[in-house]
Regions:
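Alpha-helical substrate-recognition element adjacent to the catalytic core
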Residues: 2-146
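Long, low-complexity, charged/polar intrinsically disordered regions
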Residues: 149-154
Length: 200
């Protein structure tokens, strides 16, 4: 008999790590304080009536280019190694998985974050997650970030809740996601989801 699945959905910034993930290494590498960088990104977004996350991703690329640097994937992953996780986070996954086993359920972990997937991949806990839904860059043939590949903003996070619900985890698969599906065919019922975050 298949065990019921309990999905734990996590925000990342200020939930698993202590502040915005870009603050630890990426922003200092550009010579800014976090306050300076976020003011620049937020001002750019407001002045251009942009989604705030697209504005910060644009600002990341623009500031790197202004300093003669390419924004490379490996650099962002390396930035994740400087991340400070809250006490107990690293041990949490093994503990809750074992508890789930005792209760006769399977625990799955997912990230729904407005931070950067690449930085999360360097955090040391990325392997704990079945899927990481977070902002992500597309990289050109030279390996430099040139376009947002995925934007996970504060309201479209609900799309990914539906993906987990239906078991349609591939972000490029909109057809299956939008197809009608009987409730008893959905992989993870909404009642089996727990969202962990400082806000949704």
């Amino acid at each position: 008999m298949t065990k019921p699945i309990i999905a734990l959905l996590y925000d990342f910034d200020k939930t698993l790590c202590t502040t915005d993930m870009e603050d630890y290494a990426f922003i200092p590498a550009l010579g800014y304080t976090p306050a300076e960088f976020w003011h620049k990104a937020n001002t750019f977004g407001r002045e251009n009536r942009m989604d705030g996350l697209l504005a910060y991703m644009y600002t990341m690329i623009a500031e790197c280019r202004a300093q003669g640097k390419d924004l490379k994937r490996d650099f962002l992953v390396a930035c994740g190694r400087s991340m400070e996780l809250f006490p107990g986070v690293r041990e949490w996954f093994q503990r809750i998985n074992a508890f789930g086993e005792q209760q006769g359920v399977t625990i799955e972990h997912y990230v729904l974050s407005s931070g950067l997937k690449e930085i999360i991949e360097g955090s040391g806990i990325a392997h704990e997650f079945k899927q990481i839904y977070a902002c992500e860059f597309y990289y050109d043939e030279a390996g430099a970030a040139c376009w947002p590949k995925l934007d996970v903003n504060f309201t479209n996070k609900t799309q990914f809740v539906y993906r987990i619900n239906k078991g349609v985890l591939d972000v490029a698969d909109d057809k299956t996601l939008n197809d009608s599906m009987p409730d008893d065919s959905k992989r993870v019922p909404f009642t089996n989801m727990i969202y962990v975050g400082d806000g949704l």
